[in-house]
Regions:
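Bacterial N-terminal signal peptides that target proteins for export
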Residues: 1-9
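Secretory-pathway/luminal and periplasmic proteins that interact with or process carbohydrate-rich
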Residues: 113-116, 136-140, 214-215
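Extracytoplasmic electron-transfer domains, predominantly the class I c-type cytochrome c fold
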Residues: 33, 38-43, 98-102, 128-129, ...
Length: 217
């Protein structure tokens, strides 16, 4: 809790500095004005609530750094990563590796979380929007690094072995909450934000690490 207050205070300080001229209104006033305008411009619709626009201290700190056009302070970044690492929910049954075939379907699927969805259909991961994953799929984004050969280049031949434990745990944590390892990562916090279920995260990890997955062929 103490670190959360520290991050909030530092983020506020960054925003104030970003305001520039002393005679101008404080930057935080602009932030509040913008937030108020946005909230009054939207309404709840279907499963989507206006609260989806709310941001936590992690997002605020990263946004403040963007305003300044500088990397996040190293100490703040470390504190953010520690806070987010604590939110990672490890598999209840201890099983990290799921069905890579299902993982591929999730990676290809970009549906979900819109007002026209009923909330009953599982969300997609939309992973190909930012990553190359298999060589068969030629339509992919490049915002994130290529994940092709993800397990192979990390020497994972048996993802269920003790030797692979560290890589497997890291991969699970990265999918669950990427900001646990990179404070201002552009990658969605898929598990933490409820975009993907525990089972879906398991299948995505399987897609990335199973030697039989086309990712590692």
């Amino acid at each position: 809790m103490k670190k959360q207050f520290q991050i909030a205070g530092l983020a506020a300080a960054l925003c104030t500095v970003a305001a520039g001229c002393v005679s101008a209104p404080p930057a935080m006033d602009y932030d509040k004005l913008t937030a108020d305008i946005i909230k009054t411009s939207f309404r709840d619709e279907g499963i989507v609530k206006v609260t989806v626009l709310d941001t936590d201290e992690t997002a605020k700190a990263c946004s403040a750094a963007d305003v300044m056009g500088k990397p996040l302070d190293e100490k703040i970044a470390k504190a953010i990563e520690e806070i987010n690492l604590k939110t990672v929910k490890w598999p209840a049954d201890g099983k990290f590796i799921g069905d890579w075939k299902e993982g591929e379907k999730i990676a290809q699927n970009g549906r979900g979380l819109t007002y026209s969805d009923d909330g009953k259909t599982p969300n997609g991961g939309n992973c190909y929007n930012c990553h190359q994953i298999t060589k068969e799929e030629i339509s992919f984004g490049t915002l994130g690094p290529s994940l092709y050969s993800y397990g192979k280049i990390r020497g994972v031949t048996d993802p269920r072995s003790a030797e692979s434990k560290a890589v497997v745990a890291y991969t699970w944590g990265k999918v669950w909450n990427a900001k646990a390892y990179n404070a201002c990562s552009n990658m969605p916090r898929a598990g933490h934000m409820g975009i993907l279920t525990e089972g879906q995260v398991r299948d995505i990890v399987g897609l990335l690490l199973d030697p039989q997955s086309p990712v590692n062929q």
